Amino acid sequence: MRNKYLRRARVLERDFRAVLRCFAHDLPALTAAKMCGVNKNTTHRLYGLLRQRMVALAEAEARPFVGGIVEIDESYFGPRRVRGKRGRGAGRKIPVIGLLKRAGKGFAQIVPNCSKTELLRVVHGQVKGPATIHTDGWKAYDGLVWDGFKHHRVHHHENEFARGKRHINGIESFWSFAKTRLAKQRGVRADKFPLHHKESEWRWNDRRDNLYSLLLKETRSYPLN
């Protein structure tokens, strides 16, 4: 059985397209299996392959931010609360640093911690040339000015969320998007989180496009293995 979208698989092309449409609409794999009449194990496998392709696309499309206004924020993914743990990123949460260029694309990177060293490493890797950086008041952002950036803060701890054009609403919208879609998964294993994390980035950056058409064209040109 030949499938021009998928190598070495006994899946009808119409079934693949049906599962792909569900995946593009971000439906859970079990829901897709029921809607498409495809075995749930097969559907989970297809979702995994499509997720890996999304990650490859996200990495291929990533470009440094050159100049302009860049919003930076850190967030934490994982259990809502761990008994006895307090503070930023307490417990078993996974720290992620996010950057978003105004009127442009976003970029998020998993890090060991959100220390000043890690933050500056990610910033210097992603932001090139003179840029104006907007952050919250977290002390780890100290020193951006000394590294040649213009730096504006909004102090959330003082109930300040915007001062004119000074805000980080864009990257916070990305966090909301990512956490909402991950919540639909009803739990993601830590070893699978990097895939889901980059998938969220790609979906966010291409959210105004027809994801089904993009992925159909991609898998037609470069079939999944």
Name the predicted role of every residue range.
Residues 1-225:
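Residue-level recognition of single "structural anchor" positions
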